[in-house]
């Protein structure tokens, strides 16, 4: 059985780790970095770039470079968060036939799980390159506050990437695993994990207990905001720069897609720099132009200014902390450790706010970028049976229920219930002789069903005619360890039953996932073909260079017809290489023609080399014969006895 890898599929960056015995290895990607930007670029020639190469070309290709796709995964197009992103993103977010938010790139309509699968495939390849063997199984992390649709969509992304997702676990829980197994502190501890990433915010209160030598991680409560993160902080800086530039130059940069991409890059850099310095400068020459000529942007931003811009965003993270503490039934003073996860927690103001709320300094000995992937790798080792000393008890983040008479949300499983869990309840009909019931499943905390997220619906038919309130219909909810819901309804009189795994009435159908898996496999084949084509081009370029060099040296020794034949073949090969449409077979055929035409020249070069070597050998032989007569008598006299001394080391 192969190893189960741990993947942190982040909004901004992703990371992959593996357990080797009792030590963890965060794996470097092909660029040598331990984290990979979650950025995917679709090129004109069909090539798909992932990570740093995609990020590098984003300024010149903004409409086809996709970032922060995790904010759209498992979401409906109508959701207000999606509508907010439409106004901000340089790429086109569209409404899919099923009502989900999809993205249109180069006339292709792509689902967020399909795009995220590209990042997961890069993580899979990174692990395979390191291990030297195929990887087919993974534990993937999601924000604790992800709902059922978002978890399902993440699982689909794994499948499209060619991975069997053994478990979906919550990011703060994974970070707690990494922390708990890395630290030597004994006894029971309550920890708070404050996770502010690129696109999402989570807070979890977790109890780590030592039970008969087994470490038990029990999540007491979780809360968060799946649309609050570093991307929003960047946007505040971008808005500020746009406003300042408009004041100074009278030009609105918000309408210029290329300028916006440069601003995004600079805003992110400025934010990072201001975590360690008090002031930074944003300098963007030729940012735009008007009738008076090119315009340059030069702006100083202080840490105080940045903090003023994002103060309200940081404040928004505190309310979920209050709710999580209350739901866990603990007091702030009972928290032993505060763990910071996610790149945004490097910001001094964030650390200050966390300290102010929890009344203690957060721990600095957890890597905020890697802890989540490390925890996922530990859970992978537990699932593979290689680790027996860890038990993880996670919770469902939001209440689950069904719509009952009057549009009321009747809760079946309350938020922060430990999973896996089951619950069944008996309901009846609302009308006389009702022959069928529709079960509508919702997730959320509002009293009325319409205020919550509809996860799915199904019918139970064939109920025998009876007065209202007489039939007994048992509805059962079953949440698995991934936090994914399975619902059943059974008429107790007839035994008729209907069960479904909740697939949101949006989401990808089985057929769509299968098609995307096949497309991904075809893509891998296409990548292989592109690589072979690049190799053929390189071979052709090298042959052109070496043949031209040889022609310069030996051309005059060839007959005119031979020389012309080589030059014609070279010209033909060069034109084929310049043509963007030439395939591998065409290039290889032209290479063969050049090689055949150059055969005579190769023979002449070889003959010349042989002759040169023969002449050298003859000259050396003549010189040696002259020296032998006089040298023979001296031979013994010239031998010097070497004196060796033993050097003793003290």
Curated annotation (Swiss-Prot):
> Coiled-coil region(s) at which residues?
none
Instruction: Kindly summarize what the UniProt induction comment says about this protein's expression.
Output: By stress conditions e.g. heat shock.
- Record's keyword terms, sorted: ATP-binding, Chaperone, Nucleotide-binding, Phosphoprotein, Stress response
Q: Which Gene3D superfamilies match?
A: 1.20.1270.10, 3.30.420.40, Actin, Chain A, domain 4, Substrate Binding Domain Of DNAk, Chain A, domain 1
Recorded GO molecular functions are: ATP binding; ATP-dependent protein folding chaperone; unfolded protein binding
Q: CDD domains given for it?
A: ASKHA_NBD_HSP70_DnaK-like
What InterPro entries does this protein map onto?
ATPase_NBD (IPR043129), Chaperone_DnaK (IPR012725), Heat_shock_70_CS (IPR018181), HSP70_C_sf (IPR029048), HSP70_peptide-bd_sf (IPR029047), Hsp_70_fam (IPR013126)
Residues with Phosphothreonine modification: 200
- Role of this protein: Acts as a chaperone.
HAMAP family in alphabetical order: DnaK
Family that this chain belongs to: Belongs to the heat shock protein 70 family.
Q: Which NCBIfam families match?
A: PRK00290.1, PRK05183.1, prok_dnaK
- Protein name, UniProt field: Chaperone protein DnaK
Q: Which gene encodes it?
A: dnaK
């Amino acid at each position: 059985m192969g190893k189960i890898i741990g993947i942190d599929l982040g909004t901004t960056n992703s990371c992959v780790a593996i357990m080797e015995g009792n030590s963890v290895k965060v794996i470097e990607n092909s660029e040598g970095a331990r984290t990979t930007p979650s950025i995917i670029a679709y090129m004109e020639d069909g090539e798909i770039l992932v990570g740093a190469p995609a990020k590098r070309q984003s300024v010149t290709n903004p409409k086809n470079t996709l970032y922060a796709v995790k904010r759209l995964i498992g979401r409906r197009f109508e959701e207000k968060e999606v509508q907010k992103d439409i106004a901000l993103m340089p790429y086109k977010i569209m409404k899919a036939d099923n009502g989900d938010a999809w993205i249109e790139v180069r006339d292709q309509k792509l689902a967020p799980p399909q795009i995220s699968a590209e990042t997961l495939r890069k993580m899979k390849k990174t692990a395979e390159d390191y291990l030297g063997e195929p990887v087919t199984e993974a534990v993937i992390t999601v924000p604790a506050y992800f709902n059922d649709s978002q978890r399902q969509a993440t699982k689909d992304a794994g499948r499209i990437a060619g991975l069997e997702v053994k478990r979906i676990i919550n990011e703060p829980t994974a970070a707690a695993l990494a922390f708990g197994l890395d630290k030597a502190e004994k006894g029971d501890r309550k920890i708070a994990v404050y996770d502010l990433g690129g696109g999402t915010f989570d807070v979890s209160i977790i109890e780590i207990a030592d039970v008969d030598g087994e470490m038990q991680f029990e999540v007491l409560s979780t809360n968060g905001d799946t649309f609050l993160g570093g991307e929003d902080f960047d946007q505040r800086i971008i808005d500020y720069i746009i406003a300042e530039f408009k004041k100074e130059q009278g030009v609105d940069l918000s309408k210029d897609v290329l300028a916006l991409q440069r601003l995004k890059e600079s805003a992110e850099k400025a934010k990072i720099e201001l975590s360690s310095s008090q002031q930074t400068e944003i300098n963007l020459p030729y940012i735009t132009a008007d009738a008076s000529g090119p315009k340059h942007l030069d702006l100083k931003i202080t840490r105080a200014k940045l903090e003023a811009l994002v103060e309200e965003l940081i404040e928004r993270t505190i309310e979920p902390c209050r709710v999580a503490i209350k739901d866990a039934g603990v007091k702030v003073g009972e928290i032993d450790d505060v763990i910071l996860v996610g790149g945004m927690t490097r910001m001094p103001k964030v650390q200050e706010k966390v300290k102010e709320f929890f009344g203690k300094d957060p721990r600095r000995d957890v890597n905020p970028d890697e802890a989540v992937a490390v925890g996922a790798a530990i859970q992978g080792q537990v699932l593979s049976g290689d680790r027996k000393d860890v038990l993880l008890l996670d919770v469902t983040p939001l209440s689950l229920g069904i719509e009952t008479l009057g549009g009321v949300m009747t809760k079946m499983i309350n938020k922060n219930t430990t999973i896996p869990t089951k619950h069944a309840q008996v309901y009846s009909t609302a009308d006389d002789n009702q022959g069928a019931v529709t079960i509508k499943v919702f997730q959320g905390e509002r009293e009325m069903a319409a205020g919550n997220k509809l996860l799915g619906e199904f019918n139970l038919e064939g109920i025998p005619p009876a007065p209202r309130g007489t039939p007994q219909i048992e509805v059962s909810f079953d949440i698995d360890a991934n936090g994914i819901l399975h619902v059943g309804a059974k008429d107790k009189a007839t035994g008729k039953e209907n069960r479904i795994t909740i697939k949101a009435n949006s989401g990808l159908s089985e057929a769509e996932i299968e098609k995307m898996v096949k497309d991904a496999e075809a893509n891998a084949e296409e990548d292989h073909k592109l690589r072979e084509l690049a190799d053929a081009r390189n071979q052709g370029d090298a042959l052109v260079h070496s043949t031209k060099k040889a022609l310069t040296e030996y051309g005059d020794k060839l007959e005119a017809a031979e020389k012309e034949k080589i030059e014609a073949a070279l010209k033909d090969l060069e034109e084929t290489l310049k043509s963007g449409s030439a395939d591998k077979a065409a290039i290889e055929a032209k290479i063969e023609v050049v090689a055949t035409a150059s055969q005579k020249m190769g023979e002449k070069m070889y003959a010349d080399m042989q002759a040169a070597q023969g002449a050298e050998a003859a000259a050396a032989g003549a010189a040696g014969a002259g020296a032998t007569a006089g040298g023979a008598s001296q031979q013994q006299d010239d031998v010097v006895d070497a004196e060796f001394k033993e050097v003793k080391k003290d």
